[in-house]
Amino acid sequence: MSGTGQQSVVCTIGTKVAWDDLKVFFFTLNLFNNSPPTVYLLCDTETKSRIEKDKENIYKGTLNIQDTLESYASMNRQIMERTKGKRYKTLWEDFMMEKATVLEWAFKDGAKSAFFFDSDITFFSTLPEVPANVKLALSPHFIKPVDELRYGHYNAGFVWTADPTMPEKWRSAAERSRYYDQAALEELRFNEPTTYEFPVQVNYGWWRMFQGTESPDVLKSKWTIFRNEQIPSVGLRIEGKPLNSVHTHWGEKRDPVTKTFNLWLLQQIQKISNHPKAASFARFIVREFKLQ
């Protein structure tokens, strides 16, 4: 593999509703990158103000911000799903496709390639590498086929592209999608023969553990501790390879599956108390979210 992914810029979106997620997002980008990547963020005015007041402590890399998401700022997903959209059926679908907007901004600003990450991504290493000569990289859910039929084969919160026309292709595909921006990625994959799929160690979400084709206990058994990685890591491996990133809301208080996943993962990390980055991350999560 080349270092293509690690040379890419990072794009994300988030309003004040996602502030807890953004704190973890930036903290872990700082923790596992000696030179944190350039980030493009679309947000609301409150989020922009909070970041600008404490930028040096929030993010060490270059951070470009546009507060163009004010119309979504006071609403959660449930409200947006009940609100009529402008381009799409619901406002939630409009909001999801702001992912394409932030990618377009990065390309217009001169980026050669870009990741889009949901703001609830937690990084446990440097950005994943992407093979040379690839234009699109996607993250499979690795869930049961029956769930894929509903939610899509790929997760829309972890996408890489080197194609400046991809954002508009994504918007167009979303108009025909059975599940928002997410199942739309299958159309992009069908039309892009060079697509790369990220492995299971990348973008690991609760759904991968609890909606997988194997039982949660079997999937947990594939996780191991390995303290002496030669790359920046949190000291955990899946199927013998370093854990790169997870996809979760650390501040979730109501959903029992997310809470179970978070507590289990934190417990694995706390077992590695002599691993500096693992210890730093665990302290941060316990302090911010009172998890034990």
Language-model segments: which ranges?
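N-terminal anchoring/stem segment of glycosyltransferases
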Residues: 1-82, 108-111, 265, 273-292
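Short, solvent-exposed loop/turn segments at secondary-structure junctions
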Residues: 16-18, 46-48, 121-123, 142-145, ...
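A structural signal for well-ordered alpha-helical segments within the folded catalytic domains
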Residues: 20-23, 97-101, 179-187
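Short, charged, surface-exposed secondary-structure boundary motifs
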Residues: 22-23, 27, 68-78, 145-154, ...
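Charged, glycine/proline-rich intrinsically disordered loops and linkers
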Residues: 64-91, 210-232
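GT-A fold catalytic core of metal-dependent nucleotide-sugar glycosyltransferases
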Residues: 94-148
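Conserved catalytic core of nucleotide-sugar-dependent glycosyltransferases
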Residues: 124-188
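Catalytic core and acceptor-binding pocket of nucleotide-sugar-dependent glycosyltransferases
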Residues: 161-261
